[in-house]
Design a protein with these regions (language model features):
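Phosphate/NTP-binding elements of NTP-utilizing enzymes
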Residues: 1-176
Length: 176
């Protein structure tokens, strides 16, 4: 059993195509991000998402752990249901993604072939030539909007032939 506060319940029940959450510290934005990630990777097997953060280091040390702890609470186990930062080993017998990443270093991969790429804004071009199915953007107040618009929004265009009927396909969750 998991407790959600009123603001979290409101956002989780809305489940909009595009959602923006501007909230103070301690609201529990990680649960909102984790729920969106779960909806997208489970309902779009083999999909490729993007998790945008100011820097990879900040994402891996501060942001991602608060999101992944919710997946753990919901029964998803690291190195069984998802793998962070490396290619899943063959003995897991996972499905393959529709588009296999060339580099697994900044990815979260899931048992059904879905992959979520950590997209860093500390270098330009980190989302160039990607075809993404959804975006989760954290720490929006630190995100360079021009870079986001010119690089990452353009990449949120993938796999229309597979997922066009899923309402969250090409959706965005923005938190700050």
């Amino acid at each position: 059993r998991q407790y959600f506060n009123d603001a979290q319940l409101y956002m989780l029940n809305m489940d909009c195509h595009d959602e923006v959450v501007v909230a103070g510290r301690g609201l529990g934005k990680g649960a909102i991000q984790a729920r969106r990630l779960q909806s997208c990777f489970q309902c779009m097997p083999g999909s490729m998402g993007g998790f945008v953060a100011p820097s990879v280091k900040r994402c891996l040390t501060n942001i991602l752990p608060s999101m992944l702890i919710h997946l753990e609470r919901w029964g998803f186990k690291r190195d069984i249901h998802y793998v962070v930062g490396k290619k899943p080993w063959k003995k897991l017998h996972w499905k393959s993604p529709i588009f296999t990443p060339a580099n697994w270093e900044n990815t979260i991969s899931f048992y059904n072939g879905s992959v979520c790429n950590v997209i860093s804004q500390d270098r330009s071009g980190t989302s160039n030539s990607m075809s993404l199915d959804y975006l989760i953007i954290d720490e929006a107040k630190f995100i360079n909007f021009e870079q986001l618009k010119d690089e990452t929004f353009q990449a949120n265009r993938g796999n229309e032939m597979y997922f066009s009927s899923f309402p969250l396909h090409h959706g965005m969750t923005i938190t700050s």
